[in-house]
Amino acid sequence: SLEIDELARFAVDEHNKKQNALLEFGKVVNTKEQVVAGKMYYITLEATNGGVKKTYEAKVWVKPWENFKELQEFKPVDAATS
């Protein structure tokens, strides 16, 4: 969905800022939601790093009524497990 794509892009942007990285968002592969004083989104996404496509998992916490959005976690998915 558009909302999930936006959250995935947000996750990549935040990761890039924090890590001084240059990941380019590709596409959302999978997503799960959990309700926790807002919503926790677990987004599996593809991003490109220096021309190499990899899969990452992002955890984004959203509280829309507070206009709050925070990247909780961002990590590469081990190719062996996918």
UniProtKB/Swiss-Prot annotation:
Pfam families: SQAPI
UniProt keyword Iron-sulfur present: no
Keywords: Protease inhibitor, Thiol protease inhibitor
Keyword hit for Metal-binding: no
PROSITE patterns the record matches: CYSTATIN
Record SMART domains: CY
Family: Belongs to the cystatin family.
Known role: Strong inhibitor of papain and ficin but poor inhibitor of cathepsin H, B and L.
PANTHER family named among the record's database cross-references: CYSTATIN FAMILY MEMBER, MULTICYSTATIN
Protein name: Cysteine proteinase inhibitor A
